Protein backbone atom coordinates (compact mmCIF):
# COMPACT_ATOMS: atom_id res chain seq x y z
CA UNK A 1 0.00 0.00 0.00
CA UNK A 2 1.49 3.32 -1.07
CA UNK A 3 1.97 5.95 1.63
CA UNK A 4 0.25 9.35 1.29
CA UNK A 5 2.26 12.25 -0.05
CA UNK A 6 2.10 14.22 3.21
CA UNK A 7 3.41 11.31 5.29
CA UNK A 8 6.06 12.39 7.79
CA UNK A 9 8.76 9.87 8.63
CA UNK A 10 9.92 9.25 12.16
CA UNK A 11 13.25 10.75 13.17
CA UNK A 12 16.09 8.25 13.08
CA UNK A 13 17.50 6.89 16.31
CA UNK A 14 21.19 6.21 17.00
CA UNK A 15 21.09 2.68 15.58
CA UNK A 16 19.44 3.84 12.36
CA UNK A 17 22.04 6.57 11.94
CA UNK A 18 24.88 4.07 12.40
CA UNK A 19 23.32 1.26 10.32
CA UNK A 20 22.49 3.48 7.33
CA UNK A 21 26.06 3.37 6.03
CA UNK A 22 26.76 -0.13 7.38
CA UNK A 23 23.70 -1.60 5.65
CA UNK A 24 24.72 -0.21 2.30
CA UNK A 25 28.23 -1.57 2.72
CA UNK A 26 27.05 -5.05 3.77
CA UNK A 27 24.55 -5.21 0.88
CA UNK A 28 27.32 -4.49 -1.59
CA UNK A 29 29.53 -7.20 -0.11
CA UNK A 30 26.70 -9.78 0.00
CA UNK A 31 24.29 -9.05 -2.88
CA UNK A 32 22.33 -12.32 -2.33
CA UNK A 33 21.77 -11.76 1.38
CA UNK A 34 18.20 -10.97 2.39
CA UNK A 35 17.44 -7.65 4.07
CA UNK A 36 16.18 -9.37 7.24
CA UNK A 37 19.46 -11.25 7.60
CA UNK A 38 21.37 -7.99 7.16
CA UNK A 39 19.29 -6.40 9.91
CA UNK A 40 20.04 -9.29 12.28
CA UNK A 41 23.77 -9.00 11.72
CA UNK A 42 23.74 -5.23 12.09
CA UNK A 43 21.83 -5.52 15.37
CA UNK A 44 24.36 -8.00 16.73
CA UNK A 45 27.25 -5.74 15.73
CA UNK A 46 25.58 -2.68 17.29
CA UNK A 47 25.30 -4.46 20.65
CA UNK A 48 29.02 -5.23 20.58
CA UNK A 49 29.96 -1.55 20.28
CA UNK A 50 31.08 0.29 23.40
CA UNK A 51 29.47 3.46 24.76
CA UNK A 52 32.32 5.58 23.44
CA UNK A 53 31.81 4.18 19.94
CA UNK A 54 28.03 4.76 20.12
CA UNK A 55 28.31 8.32 21.48
CA UNK A 56 28.68 10.19 18.15
CA UNK A 57 25.67 8.40 16.66
CA UNK A 58 23.60 9.13 19.79
CA UNK A 59 24.45 12.83 19.53
CA UNK A 60 23.56 12.85 15.83
CA UNK A 61 20.19 11.22 16.58
CA UNK A 62 19.44 13.91 19.19
CA UNK A 63 20.24 16.65 16.67
CA UNK A 64 17.98 15.08 14.03
CA UNK A 65 15.16 14.75 16.56
CA UNK A 66 15.37 18.42 17.55
CA UNK A 67 15.34 19.44 13.89
CA UNK A 68 12.35 17.16 13.26
CA UNK A 69 10.39 18.79 16.11
CA UNK A 70 11.03 22.26 14.67
CA UNK A 71 9.93 21.26 11.18
CA UNK A 72 6.88 19.27 12.32
CA UNK A 73 5.64 20.63 15.68
CA UNK A 74 2.28 18.81 15.37
CA UNK A 75 3.85 15.46 14.57
CA UNK A 76 2.51 12.49 16.50
CA UNK A 77 3.71 8.97 16.05
CA UNK A 78 0.89 6.70 14.90
CA UNK A 79 1.98 3.08 14.62
CA UNK A 80 0.47 1.00 11.87
CA UNK A 81 -2.26 -1.39 12.87
CA UNK A 82 -1.27 -4.98 12.80
CA UNK A 83 -3.40 -7.13 10.50
CA UNK A 84 -5.85 -9.41 12.25
CA UNK A 85 -4.60 -12.93 12.62
CA UNK A 86 -6.23 -15.25 10.15
CA UNK A 87 -7.88 -18.45 11.22
CA UNK A 88 -5.64 -21.46 11.28
CA UNK A 89 -6.09 -23.94 8.49
CA UNK A 90 -6.61 -26.83 10.88
CA UNK A 91 -9.51 -25.03 12.61
CA UNK A 92 -13.08 -24.88 11.33
CA UNK A 93 -14.59 -21.42 10.83
CA UNK A 94 -18.12 -22.83 11.21
CA UNK A 95 -19.84 -25.09 13.75
CA UNK A 96 -18.89 -28.71 13.19
CA UNK A 97 -21.46 -31.46 13.91
CA UNK A 98 -20.68 -33.98 16.62
CA UNK A 99 -18.06 -36.45 15.44
CA UNK A 100 -17.34 -34.71 12.09
CA UNK A 101 -14.12 -33.15 13.31
CA UNK A 102 -12.74 -36.54 14.27
CA UNK A 103 -13.60 -37.96 10.83
CA UNK A 104 -11.91 -35.02 9.14
CA UNK A 105 -8.77 -35.55 11.21
CA UNK A 106 -8.82 -39.35 10.62
CA UNK A 107 -9.50 -40.02 14.27
CA UNK A 108 -11.91 -42.52 15.84
CA UNK A 109 -15.43 -41.28 16.67
CA UNK A 110 -15.92 -39.54 20.00
CA UNK A 111 -18.24 -42.30 21.23
CA UNK A 112 -15.57 -44.95 20.76
CA UNK A 113 -12.96 -42.67 22.30
CA UNK A 114 -15.15 -42.05 25.35
CA UNK A 115 -15.78 -45.77 25.74
CA UNK A 116 -12.05 -46.37 25.54
CA UNK A 117 -11.28 -43.79 28.20
CA UNK A 118 -14.05 -44.67 30.67
CA UNK A 119 -15.02 -48.25 29.98
CA UNK A 120 -11.48 -49.53 29.45
CA UNK A 121 -9.92 -47.77 32.41
CA UNK A 122 -10.93 -50.48 34.89
CA UNK A 123 -9.39 -53.29 32.85
CA UNK A 124 -6.31 -51.43 31.65
CA UNK A 125 -7.61 -50.94 28.12
CA UNK A 126 -6.12 -47.82 26.54
CA UNK A 127 -7.27 -46.00 23.40
CA UNK A 128 -4.42 -47.47 21.34
CA UNK A 129 -5.31 -51.04 22.28
CA UNK A 130 -8.98 -50.43 21.46
CA UNK A 131 -8.16 -49.08 18.02
CA UNK A 132 -6.04 -52.11 17.22
CA UNK A 133 -8.53 -54.68 18.55
CA UNK A 134 -12.20 -54.44 17.45
CA UNK A 135 -13.28 -57.01 20.05
CA UNK A 136 -11.91 -54.90 22.91
CA UNK A 137 -13.58 -51.84 21.41
CA UNK A 138 -16.95 -53.63 21.29
CA UNK A 139 -16.54 -54.79 24.90
CA UNK A 140 -15.69 -51.28 26.07
CA UNK A 141 -18.67 -49.82 24.19
CA UNK A 142 -21.00 -52.37 25.80
CA UNK A 143 -19.64 -51.49 29.24
CA UNK A 144 -20.22 -47.80 28.54
CA UNK A 145 -23.81 -48.52 27.50
CA UNK A 146 -24.34 -50.55 30.67
CA UNK A 147 -23.50 -47.53 32.80
CA UNK A 148 -26.38 -45.67 31.17
CA UNK A 149 -29.09 -48.36 31.37
CA UNK A 150 -28.19 -50.24 34.57
CA UNK A 151 -27.85 -49.14 38.20
CA UNK A 152 -24.43 -48.30 39.60
CA UNK A 153 -23.63 -51.77 40.96
CA UNK A 154 -24.70 -53.48 37.75
CA UNK A 155 -22.73 -50.96 35.71
CA UNK A 156 -19.57 -51.78 37.67
CA UNK A 157 -20.16 -55.49 37.11
CA UNK A 158 -20.71 -54.86 33.40
CA UNK A 159 -17.44 -52.96 33.14
CA UNK A 160 -15.58 -55.75 34.93
CA UNK A 161 -17.20 -58.40 32.73
CA UNK A 162 -16.32 -56.47 29.57
CA UNK A 163 -12.71 -56.05 30.67
CA UNK A 164 -12.41 -59.74 31.57
CA UNK A 165 -14.02 -60.92 28.35
CA UNK A 166 -11.96 -58.66 26.09
CA UNK A 167 -8.85 -60.80 26.38
CA UNK A 168 -10.14 -64.08 24.94
CA UNK A 169 -10.88 -65.05 21.33
CA UNK A 170 -14.59 -65.58 22.15
CA UNK A 171 -15.02 -62.29 23.98
CA UNK A 172 -18.28 -61.31 22.30
CA UNK A 173 -19.89 -64.69 23.05
CA UNK A 174 -18.84 -64.47 26.69
CA UNK A 175 -20.06 -60.90 26.84
CA UNK A 176 -23.57 -61.97 25.86
CA UNK A 177 -23.78 -64.40 28.78
CA UNK A 178 -22.30 -61.83 31.17
CA UNK A 179 -24.85 -59.24 30.10
CA UNK A 180 -27.66 -61.74 30.69
CA UNK A 181 -26.43 -62.33 34.25
CA UNK A 182 -26.18 -58.60 34.87
CA UNK A 183 -29.69 -58.02 33.55
CA UNK A 184 -31.13 -60.60 35.98
CA UNK A 185 -29.26 -59.05 38.91
CA UNK A 186 -30.30 -55.52 37.95
CA UNK A 187 -33.97 -56.53 37.74
CA UNK A 188 -33.81 -57.84 41.32
CA UNK A 189 -31.85 -54.80 42.58
CA UNK A 190 -32.78 -51.21 43.21
CA UNK A 191 -35.63 -49.57 41.35
CA UNK A 192 -35.04 -47.25 38.43
CA UNK A 193 -36.22 -43.68 39.12
CA UNK A 194 -38.26 -43.37 35.94
CA UNK A 195 -40.02 -46.72 36.02
CA UNK A 196 -43.15 -45.58 37.84
CA UNK A 197 -43.56 -42.43 35.76
CA UNK A 198 -43.80 -44.49 32.56
CA UNK A 199 -46.56 -46.69 33.92
CA UNK A 200 -44.52 -49.85 34.46
CA UNK A 201 -45.78 -52.13 37.24
CA UNK A 202 -42.45 -52.08 39.08
CA UNK A 203 -38.75 -51.55 38.85
CA UNK A 204 -38.18 -55.21 38.11
CA UNK A 205 -40.01 -55.04 34.80
CA UNK A 206 -38.13 -51.93 33.71
CA UNK A 207 -34.77 -53.41 34.72
CA UNK A 208 -35.57 -56.66 32.95
CA UNK A 209 -36.60 -54.71 29.86
CA UNK A 210 -33.31 -52.84 29.63
CA UNK A 211 -31.27 -55.87 30.66
CA UNK A 212 -32.91 -58.14 28.11
CA UNK A 213 -32.49 -55.55 25.38
CA UNK A 214 -28.78 -55.12 26.12
CA UNK A 215 -28.19 -58.88 26.38
CA UNK A 216 -30.08 -59.55 23.15
CA UNK A 217 -28.16 -56.87 21.29
CA UNK A 218 -24.81 -58.27 22.46
CA UNK A 219 -25.78 -61.84 21.60
CA UNK A 220 -27.13 -60.85 18.17
CA UNK A 221 -23.93 -58.96 17.36
CA UNK A 222 -21.83 -61.96 18.40
CA UNK A 223 -23.68 -64.86 16.80
CA UNK A 224 -25.61 -63.22 13.96
CA UNK A 225 -28.02 -66.16 13.82
CA UNK A 226 -31.80 -66.48 13.96
CA UNK A 227 -33.49 -63.53 15.67
CA UNK A 228 -37.08 -63.03 16.73
CA UNK A 229 -38.98 -61.00 19.32
CA UNK A 230 -40.67 -61.51 22.69
CA UNK A 231 -43.29 -59.27 24.32
CA UNK A 232 -41.85 -57.08 27.03
CA UNK A 233 -42.82 -58.29 30.55
CA UNK A 234 -43.27 -54.68 31.63
CA UNK A 235 -45.26 -53.37 28.65
CA UNK A 236 -46.74 -55.75 26.04
CA UNK A 237 -46.76 -52.92 23.50
CA UNK A 238 -42.97 -53.28 23.13
CA UNK A 239 -41.24 -56.25 21.51
CA UNK A 240 -37.79 -57.27 22.74
CA UNK A 241 -35.41 -58.67 20.08
CA UNK A 242 -34.05 -62.04 21.06
CA UNK A 243 -31.43 -64.40 19.64
CA UNK A 244 -32.46 -67.63 21.33
CA UNK A 245 -33.80 -70.70 19.51
CA UNK A 246 -37.14 -70.70 17.71
CA UNK A 247 -38.89 -72.35 20.70
CA UNK A 248 -38.44 -70.71 24.10
CA UNK A 249 -36.66 -72.72 26.76
CA UNK A 250 -38.24 -73.83 30.01
CA UNK A 251 -36.59 -70.94 31.86
CA UNK A 252 -38.47 -68.25 29.90
CA UNK A 253 -41.90 -67.31 31.13
CA UNK A 254 -44.51 -67.50 28.33
CA UNK A 255 -46.56 -64.36 27.79
CA UNK A 256 -49.75 -64.31 29.85
CA UNK A 257 -53.12 -62.82 29.03
CA UNK A 258 -56.17 -62.30 31.25
CA UNK A 259 -59.72 -61.92 30.01
CA UNK A 260 -61.88 -59.91 32.40
CA UNK A 261 -65.52 -61.05 32.43
CA UNK A 262 -68.42 -59.58 34.43
CA UNK A 263 -68.48 -60.98 37.95
CA UNK A 264 -64.83 -62.01 37.97
CA UNK A 265 -62.41 -60.35 40.36
CA UNK A 266 -59.17 -58.81 39.30
CA UNK A 267 -56.24 -61.25 39.68
CA UNK A 268 -53.89 -60.58 42.54
CA UNK A 269 -50.81 -60.40 40.31
CA UNK A 270 -51.53 -58.13 37.36
CA UNK A 271 -48.53 -58.01 35.00
CA UNK A 272 -50.17 -55.32 32.82
CA UNK A 273 -50.68 -51.64 33.67
CA UNK A 274 -54.15 -50.53 34.70
CA UNK A 275 -54.51 -48.37 31.61
CA UNK A 276 -53.84 -51.35 29.31
CA UNK A 277 -56.36 -53.53 31.18
CA UNK A 278 -58.99 -50.82 30.89
CA UNK A 279 -58.39 -50.63 27.15
CA UNK A 280 -59.21 -54.33 26.82
Curated annotation (Swiss-Prot):
Per its UniProt record, what InterPro entries does this chain match? HMG_box_dom, HMG_box_dom_sf, SOX_fam, SRY-related_HMG-box_TF-like
- Give tissue specificity per the record: Expressed predominantly in CNS.
Give the SUPFAM superfamilies listed for this entry.
Answer: HMG-box
Which processes are annotated in GO (biological process)?
Answer: brain development; inner ear development; inner ear morphogenesis; negative regulation of DNA-templated transcription; negative regulation of transcription by RNA polymerase II; neuron differentiation; positive regulation of transcription by RNA polymerase II; regulation of cell differentiation
Give the residue range of the signal peptide. Answer: none
| Keywords recorded for this protein, A-Z | DNA-binding, Nucleus, Repressor, Transcription, Transcription regulation
Q: Which residues bind DNA?
A: 8-76
User: A single GO molecular function, which one?
Assistant: sequence-specific DNA binding
- Cellular compartments per GO CC: nucleus
Q: Which Pfam families match?
A: HMG_box, SOXp
UniProt keyword NAD present: no
Report the subcellular localization. Answer: Nucleus
* Function of the molecule: Acts as a negative regulator of transcription.
Name of this protein: Transcription factor SOX-21
Q: Which organism is it from?
A: Gallus gallus
Amino acid sequence: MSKPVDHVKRPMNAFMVWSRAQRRKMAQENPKMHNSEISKRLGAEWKLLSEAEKRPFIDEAKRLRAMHMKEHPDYKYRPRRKPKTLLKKDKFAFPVPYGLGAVAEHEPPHGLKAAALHGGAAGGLGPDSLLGNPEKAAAAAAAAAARVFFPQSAAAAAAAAAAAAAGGPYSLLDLGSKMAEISSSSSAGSALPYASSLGYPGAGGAGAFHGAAAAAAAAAAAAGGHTHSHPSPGNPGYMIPCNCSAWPGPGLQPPLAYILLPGMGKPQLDPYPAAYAAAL
